[in-house]
Every structure is written in structure tokens, then in C-alpha cells.
Amino acid sequence: MDYTISEFGKVFLFLLFGVVFVIGGYVSSRMLRPHRPNDEKLTSYECGEEAVGSAWVQFNIRFYVVALIFIIFDVEVLFLFPWATVFKQLGGFALFEAVIFVTILTLGLVYAWVKGDLDWVRPTPNVPKMPEKRFDNISSGRSQVVKEESVS
């Protein structure tokens, strides 16, 4: 009977030792460190300055859109590297599939560009200014048209 470790067994042992090493380090540091919490230790550190305001800040949605577009194209590169290494063995069909893949992603980029998601400074719409008197009539339920009084 052969008791040698297969290739997957070596990977499993490597992962097992890695997990045991990390958990062992965490547990031993929890057991050996002094535990003396105070208010100064619980405050946030901002380059030696006192913290001003709340740490919870709402970011503009444009940051997230740009980050998602970056991640999509970063993953595209991850898929194209293995394809490029075996391109000669796969032939023309692989080239056709890669062209379709890149075309679909390019169409997505063009869509985001046309939609304006890549424009950092978006143009503001030109909204006509209406007198507040008209809003009062709309919210009160009266649908009569109120004539504007001219100011001389």
C-alpha cells in the first residue's frame, strides 16, 4: 500500500499549517498581552491631531461607480492573461471568443461613458425658476392658475 501524499494533499497540508499558524499567533497574543483599556486608547488616531467630526462620512456615489468599472476591467485582464499564454495552441476559435469577450466589455464601457458615469463634473440641468406662490396653490389642491403680480 502506498502512503505518499498526493499533490492535493500537499496543498491541503500547506493550508492547514497556515491556518493553524495564524490562529495560534492570534490566540497566543490574546493570552500574553496586557489588557488595560482606557479612553485614550479607544480614540481614533489621525496623524497626531484631535479627531474632528464623525468618522462616518457619506462618499459620493461616483467613487463607487468608478471603482466598480475599474474592478470589472481588472477582472477582464485576469481572464485575458491565461488566454494569451495558450493562444497558439487554441487557434482561431480562441481569438474569436476573446474578441467577443472584449467587445462585450467595450460596449459596457461605452454605455457607462454615454450615460455620463465617467464624467466627474456632471452638468447641472437648467431648471426654470417658478415663484413660490405657484407651489402653494399646487400643494393646497387648488388647480386654478394664479396670475403673477407685476412689481413696478
UniProtKB/Swiss-Prot annotation:
Coiled coil: none annotated. Pfam families: Oxidored_q4. GO terms for molecular function: NADH dehydrogenase (ubiquinone) activity; NADH:ubiquinone reductase (non-electrogenic) activity; quinone binding. Its main location: membrane. NDH-1 is composed of 14 different subunits. Subunits NuoA, H, J, K, L, M, N constitute the membrane sector of the complex. The keyword Lipid metabolism does not apply. It is a multi-pass membrane protein. GO terms for cellular component: NADH dehydrogenase complex; plasma membrane. InterPro entries: NAD(P)H_OxRDtase_bac/plastid, NADH_UbQ/plastoQ_OxRdtase_su3, NDAH_ubi_oxred_su3_sf. It comes from Chloroherpeton thalassium (strain ATCC 35110 / GB-78). This is NADH-quinone oxidoreductase subunit A 2. It catalyses: a quinone + NADH + 5 H(+)(in) = a quinol + NAD(+) + 4 H(+)(out). It is found in: Cell inner membrane. NDH-1 shuttles electrons from NADH, via FMN and iron-sulfur (Fe-S) centers, to quinones in the respiratory chain. The immediate electron acceptor for the enzyme in this species is believed to be a menaquinone. Couples the redox reaction to proton translocation (for every two electrons transferred, four hydrogen ions are translocated across the cytoplasmic membrane), and thus conserves the redox energy in a proton gradient. Its EC number is 7.1.1.-. Belongs to the complex I subunit 3 family. The chain crosses the membrane at residues 8-28, 63-83, 90-110. It is an enzyme of class 7 (translocase). Keywords: Cell inner membrane, Cell membrane, Membrane, NAD, Quinone, Translocase, Transmembrane, Transmembrane helix, Transport.
